[in-house]
A protein has these predicted regions:
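Hydrophobic packing positions in regular secondary-structure scaffolds
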Residues: 1-167
Length: 167
């Protein structure tokens, strides 16, 4: 779909983009050429821009911000939720193409003392908003101590086993 939008003239692009459902609009926006993205951003009202930004994953928002002129970046950041704005700024501090610049901050975090059953419930509650749910990061005090997968959790026969015991 993004390729079609990249070929539209400046007058039709915003009109057709506004017809897309919200989630599809965000997915399409991410895949568009920076020139088309900028054209749309300049034509969006603040509320339209906020709707698109709110649907993006942080790393996708960072990719967009990196391609835009400063005045457009300022407008994007002003419409982003405070938490997203903070995450965007954190990722932008890393050198381009470094591990930090391509990482995602939207993942499922589990505590080592959680049970498998609690972990599955947490994934169900929070996973919808995460970009990565297949690998779960086990943390203690915001420090990574290990990994486990959704597969490991689902195949564990003891729902009362701790995450620490299966990672």
């Amino acid at each position: 779909i993004a390729a079609v939008f990249d070929e539209l003239n400046e007058a039709r692009l915003p009109l057709l983009f506004r017809l897309l459902p919200k989630e599809l609009a965000a997915e399409t926006f991410v895949e568009m050429e920076p020139e088309a993205q900028e054209l749309l951003i300049r034509g969006f009202s603040d509320s339209e821009l906020k709707e698109v930004i709110d649907e993006l994953y942080v790393d996708d928002a960072v990719d967009i911000v990196e391609e835009m002129p400063a005045n457009v970046v300022q407008r994007i950041l002003s419409q982003a939720e405070p938490d997203m704005r903070k995450q965007i700024n954190e990722i932008l501090r890393y050198p381009e193409d470094s591990a930090g610049s391509i990482m995602t901050t939207e993942y499922v975090s589990l505590r080592p003392n959680m049970t498998v059953g609690e972990a599955i419930l947490r994934i169900r509650r929070t996973g919808i908003d995460k970009e990565t749910i297949y690998t779960c990061y086990v943390t203690r005090g915001h420090k990574l101590i290990g990994l486990t997968s959704v597969k490991d959790l689902l195949l564990c026969e003891d729902d009362d086993a701790t995450i620490e015991s299966i990672m």
